[in-house]
Amino acid sequence: MSVRLRFAPSPTGNVHIGNIRAAIFNWLYARHCGGTFLLRVEDTDLERSTPEAIRTLKEVMAWLGLNYDEPEMYQTSQKDRHLAAAGKLVAAGAAYRHAKGGEGGGEAILFRLPWDAEQCPGVAVAGPCEIEIHAGTEVVVDKTGINFAMPSAKGTPMPVQKCLAGFQNLTVLDAEGTVLFSLNDVIAEVLAGKRREVIAGAVKFRFTRRTITYHDLVKGDLTKPLDSLSDFVIVRSDGSPVFHLGNVVDDVTQQITHIVRGDDHVENTYRHIFMFHALGAAVPLYAHLPMIVNAQGKPYSKRDGDAYVGDFRTKGFLPHTLLNYLALLGWSPGDDREKMTRDELVAAFSLERVKSSAAQMDIRKLTDLNGQYIAELPPAEFVKIAHGWAVAQPWGAGLDAAEFAKVCGVMQIRTKTFADIAGWGFFFTDLPAYDEKTCAKQFKDKPIQDALVMLGEEFATIPADVFTAATIEAVIHGITAACGIQQGKLNQPLRVAVTGTTVGAGIYETIELLGKGRTLPRLEHAARFF
């Protein structure tokens, strides 16, 4: 059977890198296996899942090249199917209606973890179990489960409600060991909602513990005792389906074979396995991805820096850079490659090589990778993209195409993101902006001041047609020696004098690009800061 995977986000506006990484992993695995990749929009939150939010999601996926193979499914369009499934579960005894806590007096529908849980894949008997409960709290047993209290460290009651299925062969005992209640004796009536028991004076539960285990393709075997689970709402009292119902029914409808999602869904999976079984459907394979964290090991968020795909797009990251980086954030191809083409990623990808530990976001590493990809762009493509960014700048109107191409030729290998182009203004304006503190620091020594004045005088004598990097370098070396300045020590003050910045391309190439006509007035202007 061909693999079928889905990306099922709840679009609420900006697309977090954690969500889009899940999409990337689903897409890569589907393409690696020659399977099907689907987009399912879980748009049941009508206030937040606006048309604009959905449009943003689809634009982000298109920008990253995450194409899907069938028309997208909108969860709201499946409501009738969801409610029909809930009705079948109720009819089969796998769910029940309950009015307690219902809004406006309506009935909610809860999924019941099955009393005959061993029929469900992954459920096993762990053995006899005994737990102490809070002696001063009554035990209530009804169709919704078992309500009791556990004692806190200070001895105070901590109320809990757990599913009936978690307490096979339950007996409730008092302090003398007398059996006050046996669940097996009344289980049929309790499940049918015809019996409710209230037991006072209980101090201990004895029961047969059962567990549910599933194999996670990333985390390995994961196990949970049934007595830690509760029945859960699948249809609210207002008639709207809950996430659990819609998610599982849609997976059945779309014949999903592999569910790849964040590890915040690990706990949901135990519940969903029971639902697949109750619906008579095969249980998909699961892979839960590690969380993306900051340097402190906490969930990566906007407080830590750029966290949304749109942030990186507007700051001039290439789409493949982000795809490449996020694919390797929590996954390894099995070697030391950090730059991989789309085809290489598809060929190498496997869920078995996804790491189970949290993945740390490193903006500097991502930025450096983007710089490498920018450096490899064909020059004409770089000029085209860079021009689009340049014309949006205050200095970008009326750029000379030939002059701009020359600047691109020098700056391409030094560009980390296309947002860096905002700092190219000094190439195209008469005078750059000068920072007084920077000038004061760079121009404070008298030999530097003298050298800058002498450079202006010497540059003035050079014919424009030989105002080249080689000629400029020779002049600078000569004046550096004449002023008793150590070789290289003049370059930074000179850069500030002619560009207003402390970073950029080689100073000789920069001055050649500026030309004699822009360089001389800048040296003269810089002298005002001496």
Give names to the regions the model predicted.
Residues 75, 96-288, 293-298, 333:
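Active-site cores that bind ATP or allylic diphosphates and position pyrophosphate for catalysis
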Residues 267, 279-434, 499-530:
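Catalytic adenosine-cofactor/nucleotide-binding cores of aminoacyl-tRNA synthetases and other
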